[in-house]
Amino acid sequence: KIYSRDRNLWHISHEGGALEDPANSPPEDVWMLTVSPEKAPDEPRILTLGFEAGVPVSVDGKKHSPEALVAKLNELGGFHGVGRVDICENRLVGMKSRGVYETPGGTIILEAVRTLRALTMDRDSARMCEKLMPDYADLVYTGRWFAPLREAMDAYFREATRFVTGDVRVKLYKGTATALGASSPYSLYSEDLATFGPSAKYDHADSKGFVRLYGLPGMVAAQVRSGKRAGKSVSKAASSGGGKTAKALLPSAKLAAAPIKTGKAAKKRAKQVLT
């Protein structure tokens, strides 16, 4: 069995041989970093991953260099079957390629940092991080590490994740990495605001006006498309003596009230309404 393998600190990829047919399951002898989830330990491993300004810096309270930290997580995750990925990807030259990857450390870090971002970042900044991630990955994948865009993205990530500092507990079990909880001195979570019970900081009655305004676009659209709002406009104009105004409004009101049709029937209906 012939496989093409590429390995770096972050992952190892496997292609070729039986993997060239997307219908084939990856043979067990493909994998090098991870054990089969079925053969992984029956007892989960719970670790604590520490972050400073969005960068993982420690495992279970012990500081590591970036390289040593990823290597440590690769070892722990691989032992528990974490980090297997089977994808059909799009190569830069246009063809599709099926490959399987092993990235235990990357899987653990991604699960943890997303959890910590949710706790410490405002909604818009966190969403922008998620939007930029695929583009950043494309730049790296296609060999454009030194592209100005990549440097600009790094500048955004550095600024946006300045307060992504804290600890995340992650459970490794049978091929999964699951965040169990997170804490941070910069947490934006307020129990007083989030509680479903009585709160001195948040009056649930305040939401009534917000709900009315938030639903206003949908309400107006529903009225217009059902003909109710247009009909009221015509009635109001007619009752106030504005004959010309009412006459001008009448065709659009009829169209709004008319059921939506297509083709010849639509043209015929429009002609009837406008004459």
Language model regions located:
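Nucleotide-activated chemistry modules centered on ATP-dependent adenylation/adenylyltransferase
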Residues: 1-238, 244, 250
